[in-house]
Amino acid sequence: MGRRSALALAVVSALLCQVWSSGVFELKLQEFVNKKGLLGNRNCCRGGSGPPCACRTFFRVCLKHYQASVSPEPPCTYGSAVTAVLGVDSFSLPDGAGIDPAFSNPIRFPFGFTWPGTFSLIIEALHTDSPDDLATENPERLISRLTTQRHLTVGEEWSQDLHSSGRTDLRYSYRFVCDEHYYGEGCSVFCRPRDDAFGHFTCGERGEKMCDPGWKGQYCTDPICLPGCDDQHGYCDKPGECKCRVGWQGRYCDECIRYPGCLHGTCQQPWQCNCQEGWGGLFCNQDLNYCTHHKPCRNGATCTNTGQGSYTCSCRPGYTGANCELEVDECAPSPCRNGGSCTDLEDSYSCTCPPGFYGKVCELSAMTCADGPCFNGGRCSDNPDGGYTCHCPAGFSGFNCEKKIDLCSSSPCSNGAKCVDLGNSYLCRCQTGFSGRYCEDNVDDCASSPCANGGTCRDSVNDFSCTCPPGYTGRNCSAPVSRCEHAPCHNGATCHQRGQRYMCECAQGYGGANCQFLLPEPPPDLIVAAQGGSFPWVAVCAGVVLVLLLLLGCAAVVVCVRLKLQKHQPPPDPCGGETETMNNLANCQREKDVSVSIIGATQIKNTNKKADFHGDHGADKSSFKARYPTVDYNLIRDLKGDEATVRDAHSKRDTKCQSQGSVGEEKSTSTLRGGEVPDRKRPESVYSTSKDTKYQSVYVLSAEKDECVIATEV
């Protein structure tokens, strides 16, 4: 049980240590000695066709993990091998494959994991009667057994060992070497030299990668750029290169690219344009220091920048001009007086005075007032420092008052006036249209009201203009406008002026105010008649007849209208102008012989004590409609008459005030007698008041037109 636990632990340890590695444990069998030809049980090896006690020997090798007590039993965790028959009794084994093609010396046990450094080795020498029978399970075949534990480091050197059991000797050697491209103590370091896109390196003794010249990095995939190439702004695909990233330039990619179009600027980062001193603008193309860049001022002048591309030169004495390029002629203003000659110097002048004068500008005279130097009445006074001074009268100037002053030299006269020098004064002779001492006033040409017929005058220089009212023209608006001026007549008509109007004389075949209409051709007989005389008698007669017919028609219409109005005029009021009414019946109406059942007097409210009973006459309003229709006040009449009475009522209905009772009887009859309703029915409108009032009344308002109705509340 303990052996199995140890075996399982060894297997797990081997798996845990397994990594991507590769190595080989090599065992070289060198010599085996079995002098007596005995088996392990001391029996003689028999069988086969050979001599007696001749042991045909083959080997079983078992390599396993380190065990303190080595067990020859499987499993062989690191590998196992069974050789062919290698010899009889005692024999030596050469290197390579010389004895049997199936056997190679040394015996190799490949590893796919890290070499642990320790191992257990079991080598058994076995006897077989037949080369084809290499079974190892039969203990009767065992000649000898070697079991050992060892520590072994990786290396090319062989470890020699000899095992003696008393009757047999076994000399052997072993080592552990790494496969190609594997390095390290456990052959766990893989390194394969390469020179492609995945690396450029060789391998050292311990498997470290050694980069080829010009390459760097963990796998030697990064080329070493040109020495000095900027690490951030440059890169390379091959050793010794220096390729610039976007925005950078130069051999070492350490120069930023300026903004396109930048002239006088620099950059710290790509696409910048930081202007140098004296330059400005988006592209640094605007000169802000013109003086420094162009030095425009000459002759030692001082230059001052005043803005973009502008400057000012402060000239030294004796020079002038925009750039101080012109030398000033100090003699130009003739500083020397009294006939002295001027000599121009670099920044000054010198006066050479005539005889009798001295001073810087020859302003001093050697003469005195005793010599009478002043002319034209000038007053002389001696100067304390020598010389004299002439005080000139009006109109004269000069050192000796020898120059006459021209009073007109200052052009005092305005508006083209001529100046006349009068000695001590001057006179301005004005142009036509101007006045005043200096001819500064424009004469008002509208003062005399030259514009006629209400025209508006506008003054100008020595002239005027008139704005004429409608109907007049001309310079003074005195000429009436010709109505024929704009040719108002058409079709070859002749225009004739008639005061403020015009008349068109039309050509034959045209008519209208402006002869703009084409007239139809007249009958031939009218043409012949018209040709007999120059005056158009036919047209005049036809016009007169039409006018007469129109007047007769108007008169007939007026007569018809008056007759119609007289026919519908109402008769005179039989009751007089002022009556007292009760229940819409006047006094004269109540006296009629009409039997009417009237509501009790206690229930009657007289609201119409006096009223003017009148109607609107048809003569005043021909299309008059009654304001109130005939009203039935719930009066129940006892008609004692017969149908003749009804017909009589019908005949008297047109009478205004006298027919009110009859109309009421007719309506009552039509109400009581359903079968004797007249042919023309009259619609009625009934209005009833509230029963809560003191006076209960019912109004039956007929739609029939009645012009004599007075409202009465019952």
UniProtKB/Swiss-Prot annotation:
Keyword Signal: yes
Transmembrane domains' residue ranges: 538-560
Residue stretches making up the DSL domain: 176-220
Gene3D superfamilies for the chain: 2.10.25.140, 2.60.40.3510, Laminin
Modified residues (Phosphoserine): S685, S688
Signal peptide residues on this chain, from the entry's feature table: 1-17
Disulphide-bridged cysteine pairs: C178-C187, C191-C203, C211-C220, C225-C236, C229-C242, C244-C253, C256-C267, C262-C273, C275-C284, C291-C303, C297-C313, C315-C324, C331-C342, C336-C351, C353-C362, C369-C380, C374-C390, C392-C401, C408-C419, C413-C428, C430-C439, C446-C457, C451-C466, C468-C477, C484-C495, C489-C504, C506-C515
PTM comment: Ubiquitinated by MIB (MIB1 or MIB2), leading to its endocytosis and subsequent degradation. Ubiquitinated; promotes recycling back to the plasma membrane and confers a strong affinity for NOTCH1. Mono- and multi-ubiquitinated. Multi-ubiquitination of Lys-605 by MIB1 promotes both cis and trans-interaction with NOTCH1, as well as activation of Notch signaling. Ubiquitinated by NEURL1B.
Annotated stretches, region: Interaction with MAGI1: 711-714
Topological domain ranges for the Cytoplasmic compartment: 561-714
Domain EGF-like: 225-253, 256-284, 291-324, 331-362, 369-401, 408-439, 446-477, 484-515
Name this polypeptide is given: Delta-like protein 1
Organism the protein comes from: Rattus norvegicus (Rat)
